[in-house]
């Protein structure tokens, strides 16, 4: 039997829009701690608080995003959120006070929270159900390519250009992404009956256990994407920190090429479990790097890159599986809510990781302690998924 068609113009446009959105995001992500330190003289704890405002704002808007997307036309909401996300990069260039920067960061988080839920939901509308896992994998691959180039280019530009130039490049990327988003055509959506507002219109209750497991897993991920460059500088690793993101993105990209197909074959819980085992190992090794640097700096530098690649494989394996897991627990008229719950769970953990990572490093004297605590949380998440979230999914999945 011939496979359902995966590639379409709208699928290509939304991939491009997603890449440009995340390129704009990742371009400034690793330089923001340095920007706050240089421009506003913020300490590690304050940096963690400010950066977490973005994630907390995205978290707050996620449940409402899911409800709005399940109730109203999705494309206009997607374009509105994308335009706001794009414009705020210009605001960073004129923010002369820390308080103004914080307000802009919160607004940016709201826009990011809405546009990512909308993009994921529209993607699911476009994809044939028989190739959903594969399509989600390629969609995530666009994120990974952005992650491969964005942080590396951002860190390079930090040493050669002003911060305003970097923000301008993010603004340009966002503008091009908005054009791509405008080209996306969505299938006709049947009007739905306006049901009374209840908890399950904002949060997929059946996804609670999987959400807890994903939340625990995302805490150390948030610590890594934000603080790994500072950690490398702290312990004296000579490798360009931008390479960490490049190799991590390579791992994410390679793993997505096969994990989505395994998900479409029904091996969702197996794929997630294997990814969790590898993720736990990478965080323990990341925590051990500080001590290993005293033993053999050259070996530790190579290990640093190896950890990045392995971490990418671990999370790239899990992302399409977790996304599909939430969608498969929900009826078709709650796709937005399912996507919102998936991303909300992720954002809660990222926000905790941003705040906790800086605070742990400040109080205990190094980011290695933050990554050690993150490794322990990954082990806890693995046990929780194996004995609670996974069995619950197998009992309650709708497809």
What are the language-model segments listed below?
Residues 9-48, 218-231, 235-237:
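Helix-loop boundary and gating motifs at the non-cytosolic
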Residues 41, 73, 94-99, 267, ...:
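Helix-breaking motifs and short loop linkers at transmembrane-helix boundaries and internal kinks
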Residues 55-63, 147-148, 249-253, 257, ...:
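Residue-level signature of mid-helix packing/kink "hotspots" within the transmembrane helices
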Residues 60-96:
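Conserved MFS/SLC helix-loop-helix module at the cytosolic interface between two early adjacent transmembrane helices
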Residues 76-90, 171, 270-285:
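Structural signature of the two symmetry-related core transmembrane helices
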Residues 99-107, 302-310:
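Paired small-residue
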Residues 106-142:
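Cytoplasmic helix-loop-helix junction between adjacent transmembrane helices
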Residues 171-190, 384-388:
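C-terminal membrane-cytosol helix-exit motif in multi-pass small-molecule transporters
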């Amino acid at each position: 039997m011939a496979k359902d068609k995966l590639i379409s113009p709208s699928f290509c446009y939304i991939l491009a829009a997603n890449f440009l959105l995340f390129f704009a995001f990742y371009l400034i992500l690793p330089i923001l701690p340095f920007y706050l330190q240089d421009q506003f003289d913020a300490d590690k704890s304050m940096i963690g608080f400010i950066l977490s405002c973005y994630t907390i704002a995205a978290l707050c808007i996620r449940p409402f995003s899911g409800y709005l997307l399940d109730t109203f036309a999705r494309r206009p909401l997607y374009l509105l959120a994308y335009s706001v996300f794009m414009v705020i990069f210009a605001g960073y260039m004129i923010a002369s006070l820390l308080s103004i920067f914080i307000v802009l960061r919160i607004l940016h988080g709201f826009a990011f929270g809405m546009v990512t839920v909308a993009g994921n939901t529209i993607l699911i509308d476009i994809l044939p159900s028989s190739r959903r896992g594969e399509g989600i994998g390629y969609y995530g691959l666009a994120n990974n390519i952005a992650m491969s180039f964005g942080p590396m280019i951002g860190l390079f530009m930090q040493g050669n250009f002003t911060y305003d130039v970097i923000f301008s490049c993010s603004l340009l990327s966002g503008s091009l992404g908005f054009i791509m988003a405008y080209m996306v055509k969505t299938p006709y959506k049947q009007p739905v009956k306006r049901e009374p507002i209840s908890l399950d219109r904002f949060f997929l209750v059946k996804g609670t256990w999987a959400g807890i497991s994903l939340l625990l897993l995302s805490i150390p991920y948030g610590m890594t994407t934000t603080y790994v460059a500072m950690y490398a500088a702290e312990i004296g690793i000579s490798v360009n920190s931008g390479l960490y993101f490049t190799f991590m993105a390579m791992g994410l990209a390679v793993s997505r090429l096969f994990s989505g197909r395994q998900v479409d074959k029904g091996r969702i819980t197996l794929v997630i479990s294997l990814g969790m085992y590898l993720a736990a190992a990478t965080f323990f090794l990341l925590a051990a790097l500080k001590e290993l640097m005293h033993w053999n700096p050259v070996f530790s530098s190579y290990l640093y890159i190896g950890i990045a690649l392995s971490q990418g494989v671990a999370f790239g394996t899990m992302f399409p599986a977790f996304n599909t897991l939430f969608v498969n627990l929900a009826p078709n008229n709650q796709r937005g809510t399912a996507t919102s719950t998936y991303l909300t769970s992720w954002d809660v953990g990222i926000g905790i990781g941003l705040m906790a990572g800086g605070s742990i490093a400040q109080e205990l004297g190094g980011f290695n302690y933050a990554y050690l605590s993150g490794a322990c949380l990954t082990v806890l998440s693995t046990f929780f998924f194996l004995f609670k979230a996974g069995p619950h999914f197998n009992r309650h999945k709708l497809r």
